[in-house]
């Protein structure tokens, strides 16, 4: 199977991001993950559990949102949003992972934070999220990312990548999995290629045959 190159966005440092002018908006999101020694069906290693969420608009993304830099630091703004969607979890500058400039007409710098939890702590976050203020409103539920690929080369991570993601969320997921050494680059590219091929075939089925 041919592979697809993992897409890249322009990465800048936190310091560079802080020097951007008032014409830029800042979004802050958190990737919470835990090592998972479990096996699916007793034979497929789970390796890690990563949390994402289904949003009100039907798109997948990481917990977080926009931060108004006039009133909040990045971390304070992020924690404020997380409190509405997850509960009492608080991240710090030590959890900062990356900043990327988004493509398109809107000038947005996307900041990603990542924290490794124990599997028990991750499960506690899932339980807490159900009782948060935004559950069932802006947040429709947390999901765990399947970081495995089944024998058909589509089930698992490739199928997950075939979903619709908000803004830079899909790229941030791929970037974090790579830089945190959670999945080799070639495996990421293979999964992305399988997802792209699946989407292409689905689109071909919807389009009328050319005369």
Curated annotation (Swiss-Prot):
GO terms for biological process: negative regulation of double-strand break repair via nonhomologous end joining. Its main location: nucleus. There is a cross-link at residues 10, 151 (Glycyl lysine isopeptide (Lys-Gly) (interchain with G-Cter in ubiquitin)). GO terms for cellular component: nucleus. The record marks 10 as: Required for interaction with TP53BP1. Keywords: Isopeptide bond, Nucleus, RNA-binding, Ubl conjugation. Disulfide bonds: none annotated. It is found in: Nucleus. One of its GO terms (molecular function) is snoRNA binding. Residues 118-205 are annotated as: Interaction with PXN. CDD domains: NUDIX_U8_SnoRNA_DE_Nudt16 (cd18869). InterPro entries: NUDIX_hydrolase-like_dom_sf, NudT16. Key regulator of TP53BP1 required to stabilize TP53BP1 and regulate its recruitment to chromatin. In absence of DNA damage, interacts with the tandem Tudor-like domain of TP53BP1, masking the region that binds histone H4 dimethylated at 'Lys-20' (H4K20me2), thereby preventing TP53BP1 recruitment to chromatin and maintaining TP53BP1 localization to the nucleus. Belongs to the Nudix hydrolase family. TIRR subfamily. Homodimer. Interacts with TP53BP1 (via the Tudor-like domain); interaction is abolished following DNA damage and TP53BP1 phosphorylation by ATM. Interacts (via the cytoplasmic part) with SDC4. Interacts with TGFB1I1 and PXN. This is Tudor-interacting repair regulator protein.
